[in-house]
A protein has these predicted regions:
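Terminal low-complexity tails and localization/encapsulation signals of metabolic enzymes
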Residues: 205-207, 217-218, 222-354, 358-361, ...
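Short beta->alpha connector loops at strand-helix junctions that form conserved
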Residues: 480-482, 510, 568-569
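Conserved small-residue-rich beta-alpha loop and adjacent elements
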Residues: 428-503, 574
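Single conserved hydrophobic/aromatic residue that forms the stacking wall/gate
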Residues: 1-8
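Positively charged, amphipathic and often flexible ligand-engagement surfaces
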Residues: 9-283
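ALDH superfamily catalytic-core signature
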Residues: 498-500, 522-524, 528, 535-594
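A structured beta-alpha segment of the ubiquitous adenosine-cofactor-binding alpha/beta core
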Residues: 439-441, 507-527
Length: 594
């Protein structure tokens, strides 16, 4: 008999960012459970689970293998998913581990049960490529290659083949030749007819080859997700079990050789699953990576550290010769100085408004296509300097590492989105219907000068979104960052200037909100305001704009960022707990977006 616990059912904190805690808290628990299994002559197999957890689970398994309590025991095993592109290297690592610890490791080879999740997470994460094969034939070929590697593992690997596929059964038998030191596995309630026929025809038990039946054990809440995954797996159009039940499916197709199938496909990857960076139909997706991937995370952390080796400086437009500087402190440790800012005065704001007003016409006349090219170039520069921007998000704004990465990605997405809108709506005039003899067209143009006032909780993303939207529409911009986060905003403005936005079109005005606001809002040359913050402040801006003489100014306001969470009886408690923690510690629960 064999126990197969899922560590994630015990701890939702099973993530690489909490590596030290996992090794300190989870490993002793698993060692204790495995020791009990050893004493009861039971096997004990843990799961590598999703791709994001693979490196962490391999570290956990290595610690279990080295535990003194579990020595001289060949019952400690690991389940490996063949649909992961790292399955073969994982088996090679396990083989070396088994030899190093002089143990035979039971390896349960499965095809994988989280394919949809792996694809979706890779798309959301904007990673370079998918961690799993995108065609079923690719997974089937990988399974065969992994089986061959397991047989080649000698005394370091005890192969356990979990499958409900007749072709896979036949391949395993062929690869095994005369070997009998392995076993087949199936799930309770699945593959019974297949294995009945297999046992009648091939009589594996008589040759000493066992077939283990896996049965789920647990509460209804724990088993529900498992059962749903099994239904999705067996209900998939490409599933062997599902196709076998289809009387119209040709038998030759059902038992086709996956190697031949994959070789006949061009391209080998699924063309309907574009790479995460290319998945959007009309623009590039922002680039990201998984913090659970040490190969990506370690260089990013090192570059973040290097980028803040020297103090940062933000200078308001026109204040280059000003003397007064203000320190910017780390919100998580007020003793730590991140940099300095030279703030704008009301006089600086008025000079900037005059300069922007003169430059607005030429910027608008540039056309939507040219402005879009500049914004797209800026998005590329944001991604080039991603580590520096992330470091500022962490040190200046108090962001966690995942939210810092999300901050930069969202800013890049804003730039590319508004570039797309600029091309679509501001490049060419649109022909309108009209009476015979009339030629009616409509073209969109910038209003003039926009003030963009951003919040502290998304100091780069919302700041960039406001500025990019106004620039894309042909407006000159006076960019006012939150008083708490001028450094990251200054870095964004610097990259926009580097991308080609003229300095007299985009002005940077950090400083006291009411003082700068009073200098700008009463001036009729200000055509509009984009504001994210409190409802009270938005109402004050609205009243100030309405009270002045001159053209009516536009106000785009996003307000009221203190959210309530409503939880009903159908919610999963562990999901609620994760969401509550995220809400409490990301922006202290104050977000203007769900």
């Amino acid at each position: 008999r064999n126990l197969h616990p899922f560590p994630t059912r015990r701890s939702s904190d099973l993530e690489y960012a909490k590596h030290e805690r996992v090794m300190r808290e989870l490993v002793p628990t698993l060692i204790s459970l495995a020791a009990e299994a050893k004493a009861a002559y039971l096997g004990f197999t843990i799961d590598a689970e999703e791709a994001e957890r693979l490196d962490l689970m391999l570290d956990v398994f290595e610690a279990l293998s080295a535990a003194p309590e579990l020595q001289n025991w060949n019952g400690l095993g690991l389940a490996v998913q063949a649909y992961q592109k790292r399955a073969l290297p994982t088996l090679g690592w396990l083989t070396e581990l088994g030899r190093a610890h002089k143990r035979r490791i039971p390896v349960r080879l499965v095809k994988g049960a989280y394919w949809d999740t792996e694809i979706k997470r890779a798309q959301e994460g904007g990673v370079t490529d998918y961690p799993v094969f995108t065609r079923k034939a690719g997974t089937d070929v990988s399974y065969i290659a992994c089986a061959r590697a397991m047989f080649a593992g000698g005394d370091a690997i005890y192969p356990q083949f979990a499958t409900h596929n007749a072709h896979t059964l036949a391949v395993i038998e062929t690869l095994a030749a005369s070997r009998t030191d392995f076993e087949f596995q199936r799930l309770h309630g699945m593959g019974e007819a297949l294995y009945d026929v297999f046992h009648d025809l091939r009589k594996p038990a008589a040759r000493g080859i066992g077939t283990r039946v896996y049965a789920p054990v647990g509460s209804h809440e724990d088993l529900l997700a498992y059962l749903v995954r099994r239904l999705l797996e067996n209900g998939a159009n490409t599933s062997f079990v599902n196709r076998l039940a289809d009387e119209e499916a040709p038998i030759d197709d059902i038992v086709a050789d996956p190697v031949a199938t994959l070789s006949s496909l061009t391209p080998r990857r699924n063309p309907r699953l574009l790479l995460p960076h290319d998945m959007l139909p009309d623009r590039k997706n922002s680039q990201g990576f998984f913090w659970s991937d040490p190969a990506a995370a370690a260089p990013a952390l090192a570059e973040m550290k290097r980028s803040l080796a020297s103090s940062q400086l933000a200078i308001a437009s026109g204040a280059e010769n000003a003397r007064g500087v203000k320190s910017v402190l780390d919100p998580s440790d007020r003793r730590r100085k991140v940099g300095e800012v030279v703030e704008a005065t009301p006089e600086h704001a008025k000079v900037a408004l005059q300069s922007a007003h003169r430059a607005a016409h030429d910027w608008d006349a540039l056309g939507g296509d040219a402005r879009a090219t500049i914004l797209e170039r800026a998005a590329d520069l944001y991604e080039r300097d991603r580590a520096h921007l992330m470091a500022l998000a962490v040190r200046e704004a108090g962001k966690t590492l995942p939210t810092a990465l999300g901050e930069v990605r969202e800013a890049a997405d804003f730039l590319r989105y508004y570039a797309k809108r600029a091309r679509a709506e501001f490049q060419n005039a649109e022909q309108l219907p009209g009476p015979t003899g009339e030629d009616n067209k409509i073209s969109l143009h910038g209003r003039g000068v926009f003030a963009c006032i951003a919040p502290w909780n998304f100091p780069l993303a919302i700041f960039t979104g406001q500025v990019a939207g106004a620039l894309a529409a042909g407006n000159a911009v006076l960019a006012k960052p939150a008083e708490q986060t001028p450094l990251i905003a200054a870095a964004g403005v610097k990259l926009l200037h580097e991308a080609g936005v003229p300095e007299d079109v985009l002005h940077f005005l950090p400083g006291d909100g009411p003082a700068i606001g009073n200098a700008l809002l009463s001036d009729a040359r200000l055509a509009g305001v984009a504001f994210t913050g409190s409802t009270e402040a938005a109402n004050a801006i609205n009243r100030a704009l309405a009270a002045r003489d001159g053209p009516i100014a536009a106000l785009i306001a996003e307000t009221g960022g203190q959210n309530a969470m409503i939880v009903d009886s159908t919610a999963l408690p562990e999901q609620v707990a994760r969401d509550v923690l995220a809400s409490a510690f990301d922006s202290a629960g104050q977000r203007c977006s769900a």
